[in-house]
Amino acid sequence: MKNDIEFTLKGSVYSIPNSWEGLNTFQFKELVADLISMSAGKLSAGLVRVRHVCRVMGWDINKITDADAMGNIACLAEQVTFPFLICYPDNDAALADLDTDSYELCKRVPPERLTGITISRYLSRLDYKFVVDSCFCKQFIASVHIDGQDEPCLGYTIDTGFSMLTTSLTAQQFIDARELADCRDEQLPLLASILYSSLPYESDKAHQRAVLFSKVDIKTLQANRFNFKGFINYLFSRTEYKILTKIIPGKESVISTGAQYALYGLSADGYGNLREISQMSVLQYLGILRKKMIESVRSLHASKMDVAEIANTTRLPIDVINDIL
């Protein structure tokens, strides 16, 4: 998919972002608000895309009355693919035999607009639906202003420069915030307080300061939640840390514990005292957990345990175990 949609209007070339990372703060917050309205049944996926185009171009959708003009906007909007994935029945069973490129295309482009895909007509007859694709690596809301305070509260940072990922989030801060990633709107001030805390991060102080963030507008608080969830999804689907989410649900495994309990485990293993570990970078923390998981699998294999037994002991899928070995 193209990251930008370019078109010519009255001799000038314009560009519309077609990726989360291409949005600015205003565009991000407004799009998140539209997606929330869509989840409440107030907007369709098509109208969300149309509003995105109008927003970027500075057009007032309520003032567009010409049918041809609206048709042209709708044509542009159909090319906007980044906010959604398309889900087909039975966990995308119809896409099972497609190559990787065709699969990705079918997950983004409605079947009625697919070209060069032999099963597009069949797909168009299926009961497919759009779901929000919240997976990206960018901090859109660098700071939050609270009424009555002179200085804004600075949030966590995300940097992907020079093909390297870094973040200011600490292990404890990430753990606390992740517990609230799907929180109700009433808990949004607490989530914001956690993510916009100064370092060194302290859980109790973040809790105490949460009342201050009740003064922040709801659109910003909701966008902050969406932003953090997008980063979580990115970490655990597009980086080396995705292995940490592969454990199959079931009884407790020898290498799977709660994130908070894992802090105590690392302290017992000599990585530092509890405070030192809780203040370490979340990426360092996840890296250690990943390393311990891989070492555990290899240790079990070295003890002559076969792959099936390792899978039963660790609750990791066999394909993941084979990749490790």
Regions found by a protein language model. Name each.
Residues M1-S303, R315-I324:
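An amphipathic, hydrophobic-aromatic interaction surface with interspersed Lys/Arg
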Residues E309-N312:
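Short alpha-helical "recognition helix" segments of helix-turn-helix
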